[in-house]
């Protein structure tokens, strides 16, 4: 009996050793998996730190640098979006029952429309008090982050030896046939701003768009190029030698991309307009959206706008060195004020009349 017990003990010992080794291996593997999951957990959480912005295209206003800085500073990823102002509002309206976007960037007259349509909500971000009263909605539905002045963004190498145009009248000359581009004013805010600028410069008002519409009728004979969205790359390539656009795009091309370009403020006059941001009503990542809005008005965010040759709403963010690269103040004196609220009221009806004229 003792020998049988001894033989049993001897036979069972290797089995216990094998089981122990298996258990140890499994435990070790489990610890490795647990450690790996723990290491991945912060990254997974970080990946969820997203804010969706409508109308934040990388080629426009150097949103590329701004979005990169937002992620570095806050950990929030903001995907690029190439909608224009009109397309953004249409999308927000279509998504009202189940919003997708958190924040939206708009031309100022489009912001009035967004408020009327009920697709944005109030939020007064950090540095709210630094924004001039005429550059924000008093309740906080929208606020300016920067502004630009309308003019001609000219690729001089693509002019084929022709002189740089200096006036709205110049663009109607046969020598510039097929050379002038502008964004569709029935959809893109910059296109509508250009229409308001030429109309006002030629003696029109927001109650009388006939001078501007007559100019578009004449320009139609000169075969203009009318893209739907930002056309910076097409100017740089020479496809569009002359684009009705803001000063900041031309300065970016000249000073950052070292292109042979010029910005012209037409001699008859123009306008300067603000661009604004808003928190989307029902934003799915509302807290992240608010952080984005805080950042674009922060010292760092405003300096980035200034470095991209936009006029930051917090004027002290622009350095003297950057300001010196702009055209002289005497040229900017030709940019006249406009009633942005009324500009918003007239945008839809102007768009309809423009389409009738051009089609």
For each feature predicted by the language model, list its residue ranges.
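Extracytoplasmic ligand-binding site segments that recognize negatively charged/polar headgroups
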Residues: 56-64, 100-239
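Periplasmic-binding protein-like
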Residues: 130-133, 148, 213-218, 224-225, ...
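A bilobed periplasmic-binding-protein/Venus flytrap-type ligand-binding module shared by bacterial periplasmic
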Residues: 151-158, 196-201, 273-286, 304-305
């Amino acid at each position: 009996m003792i020998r049988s017990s001894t033989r049993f003990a001897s036979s069972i010992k290797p089995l216990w050793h094998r089981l122990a080794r298996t258990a140890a291996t499994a435990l070790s593997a489990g610890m490795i998996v647990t450690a790996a999951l723990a290491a991945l957990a912060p990254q997974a959480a970080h990946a969820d730190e997203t804010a969706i912005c409508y109308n934040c295209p990388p080629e426009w206003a150097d949103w590329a640098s701004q979005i990169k800085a937002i992620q570095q500073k806050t950990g929030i990823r903001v995907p690029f979006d190439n909608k224009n102002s009109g397309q953004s509002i249409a999308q927000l309206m279509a998504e009202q029952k189940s919003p997708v976007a958190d924040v939206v960037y708009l031309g100022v007259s489009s912001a009035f429309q967004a408020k009327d349509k009920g697709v944005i909500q109030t939020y007064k971000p950090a540095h709210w008090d630094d924004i001039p009263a005429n550059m924000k909605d008093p309740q906080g539905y929208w606020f300016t982050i920067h502004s630009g002045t309308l003019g001609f963004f000219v690729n001089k190498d693509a002019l084929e030896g022709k002189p740089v145009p200096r006036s709205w009248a110049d663009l109607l000359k046969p020598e510039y046939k097929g050379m002038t581009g502008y964004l569709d004013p029935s959809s893109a805010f910059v296109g509508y701003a250009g229409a308001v600028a030429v109309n006002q410069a030629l003696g029109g008002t927001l109650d009388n768009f006939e001078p501007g519409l007559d100019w578009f009728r004449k320009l139609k004979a000169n075969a203009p190029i009318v893209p739907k969205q930002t056309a910076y790359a097409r100017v740089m390539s020479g496809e569009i030698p002359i684009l009705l656009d803001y000063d900041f795009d031309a300065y970016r091309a000249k000073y950052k991309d070292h292109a042979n370009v010029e910005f012209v403020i037409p001699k008859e006059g123009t306008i300067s307009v603000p661009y604004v941001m808003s928190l989307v009503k029902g934003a799915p990542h509302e807290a992240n959206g608010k952080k984005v809005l805080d950042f674009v008005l922060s010292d760092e965010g405003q300096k980035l706008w200034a470095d991209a040759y936009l006029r930051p709403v917090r004027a002290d963010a622009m350095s003297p060195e950057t300001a010196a690269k702009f055209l002289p103040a005497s040229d900017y004196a030709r940019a006249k004020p406009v009633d942005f609220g009324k500009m918003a009221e007239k945008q839809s009806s102007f768009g309809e009349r423009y389409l009738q004229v051009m089609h």
